[in-house]
Regions:
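Metal-cofactor-binding active-site regions of metalloenzymes
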Residues: 1-194
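Conserved small/polar residues in nucleotide/adenosyl-binding loops
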Residues: 197-198
Length: 198
């Protein structure tokens, strides 16, 4: 039994890297509830406990349902900062020294939130993490698989204004019926713009 605890202790103390984290998916029930009140966004939950109960999902699509409910409460730059900063505090607790964060601009642009608002909130928290805790990071932008490829080109264009912050692009959201081949031209364009493709 002591060996088990010493192994867990060793793992907790060891420096770690998190290479695949979707920042919107890290939204905790408490922050979702708080932001829904602050931004006057209705969510289908009356309490933090109801949100927490909804987090017991059985597959990707059931996870995406709660994921998109959460994205709706993110409106202001400060919301994206708070979302990212809460994640960073968990990184510090788990001794994560480097993280690569994915984000979904299309989830927010469709609601009228500007690209600049999204990226600046996330980036500001990551810069503070480096300064305060020495946690390094990279940002990867994702395109939503369930949307048409054509709609992604405008998002890629907006990302060009933030080349200093975004190191690459990828895909996320519902995989069923949405293979990577659907985005062939988009990824060719991204590679021409010197974006890494993941």
């Amino acid at each position: 039994m002591n060996n088990l605890y010493s192994n867990i202790d060793f793992i907790k103390k060891s420096p770690k890297t998190e290479l695949h984290l979707h920042i919107e998916g890290s939204l905790e029930p408490e922050l979702m509830f708080k932001l829904s009140k602050k931004n006057k966004i209705e969510i289908p939950f009356k309490t933090v406990e109801e949100i927490r109960s909804a987090y017991s999902f059985s597959n990707l699509d059931s996870f995406l349902k709660i994921y998109y409910e959460g994205t709706n409460v993110l409106i202001q730059e400060e919301d994206f900062f708070d979302l990212t900063w809460e994640y960073i505090l968990r990184c510090k607790q788990d001794n994560i020294v480097h993280t690569e964060i994915f984000f979904d601009p299309q989830s927010h642009l469709s609601r009228g939130v500007s690209f600049k608002t999204i990226i600046n909130g996330i980036d500001r928290a990551l810069k503070k993490a480096e300064k305060d805790f020495g946690i390094s990071s990279k940002i990867i932008m994702c395109f939503l698989r369930h949307l048409e490829e054509e709609s992604c080109f405008e998002v890629l264009k907006q990302a060009c204004d933030h080349k200093d912050k975004i190191i690459g692009v990828g895909l996320d959201s519902s995989e069923k019926g949405n293979p990577p081949a659907k985005f062939k031209r988009l990824f060719e364009r991204a590679m021409k713009d010197r974006k890494s493709v993941v």
